[in-house]
Amino acid sequence: MTDLLRAAGAVVWRGEESRPEVAVIHRPAYDDWTFPKGKLKTGEHVIAGALREVHEETGMTVRLGRALPPVHYFSRGRLKRVDYWAGRMVADDGFVPGEEVDELFWLPAEEARARLTYEWDAGLLRALAVAPLESVPLVLVRHGSAGARNEWAGEDALRPLDPEGASQAARLATALPAYRPEVLMSSPSARCVETLVPYGGGIKVEPLLSEESQDPHKTPVLVGDLTVAAAVCSHGKVLPALIHALSGKDVHLRKGAFAVLHRLDGRVVSVERYTT
């Protein structure tokens, strides 16, 4: 639906996972109590939009956990979709009351449910409670668009991103901060390395992620042994088998897309797929 309004936000939490507190905001224009969210800017990645809106409305930086069910409702005659995530507060620049948001309270889930204006927000709290809040994200990325293989005269491993692929890499760089990866790993192919470069340096090149050297046993062990948040870029011929080996899920990614595998004690508890 081309007329669909898009927005994004998060249920921001802090404290112990067994008894978290969530951030509830008051919007004077609507006189409602809700969770931080807002409309996406033109061309903005939905994950980047969620990070931005949370920071603008609360002053907080969050690390996103698993996605929560999206909310749909009509706003001024147009259907609106709001994507939400669980978001652990990792930094706080301080809440500044303003015209859009004038109050913020940290509340236990039970008190937050009683304070919230909308039933769909109460539904987000219920979704928050049914699965672990803390997880270790593994972001598996298919390299961006790199033109046609048969139109490249040089060595295939040197084939670079094309303009569309560069744009995809730039959008990926706005989404990856949500997961705060400590390890960046890539196939040696230029198009894979270039897909991660806009996010940051320190990329470890790993031949087992290449099309030529992938191994159905060694490659999943290599990636599965990562115990911290990580982003890994590889190929369309490598990633489906890798994702299945790690999660048991059949996930196919178009160029520039990525899957987020949320892991708890080494076990994948949730798989999400996003485009750029």
What is each residue range found by the language model?
Residues 1-35, 138-143:
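N-terminal strand-loop-strand
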Residues 12, 26, 84-88, 106, ...:
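Short, well-ordered beta-strand micro-motif
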Residues 18-61, 150-160:
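Conserved Nudix-box catalytic region and its N-terminal flanking loop in Nudix hydrolases
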Residues 31-32, 94-152, 236:
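Nudix hydrolase/Nudix homology domain
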Residues 38, 49, 134-215, 249-253, ...:
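Active-site-proximal alpha-helix that buttresses catalytic centers in soluble enzyme cores
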Residues 40-66, 70-124:
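Unchanged
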Residues 138-139, 226-234:
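Generic beta-sheet signal
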Residues 247-272:
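Domain-level recognition of soluble alpha/beta enzyme cores
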